[in-house]
Regions:
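Catalytic phosphate/metal-binding cores of nucleic-acid and nucleotide-processing enzymes, i.e., regions
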Residues: 1-108
């Protein structure tokens, strides 16, 4: 299975290859804890992705931030390497304005 960093790079590359703006969020002393790892604009839609290694677990604060983004109308997910195809489907759906806001938060 992919490491968290290699999976993160795969996601960023896919976003870039599809013309999406994306930024890797680096938390530090002055930033807000729990913010997802990747923040992106996909065809005008806000997408936030908390990237996890296959055995990783999101913190409660990370889940709260994902929920806050979804409540604000954005798309936010916790993505695992085994959920790569689901994540690609979500990104592809945003690219063509066809998406399901009811998709599970955890993509495994």
């Amino acid at each position: 299975m992919a490491s968290e960093k290699s999976f993160e790079n795969k996601i960023k590359r896919y976003l870039k290859d599809n013309g999406c703006y994306r930024v890797k969020y680096h938390g530090n002393y002055f930033s807000e804890n729990g913010t997802p790892d990747i923040l992106a604009c996909v065809n005008g839609y806000f997408l936030a992705i908390e990237v996890k290694a296959q055995t990783g677990t999101p913190s409660e604060l990370q889940l709260v931030k994902v929920d806050d983004i979804r409540k604000a109308g954005g798309f936010a997910y916790v993505a695992y390497p085994s959920g790569w195809e689901k994540l690609k489907d979500i990104i592809d759906g945003l690219l063509i304005d066809r998406f399901n806001r009811e998709e599970d938060v955890i993509l495994k």
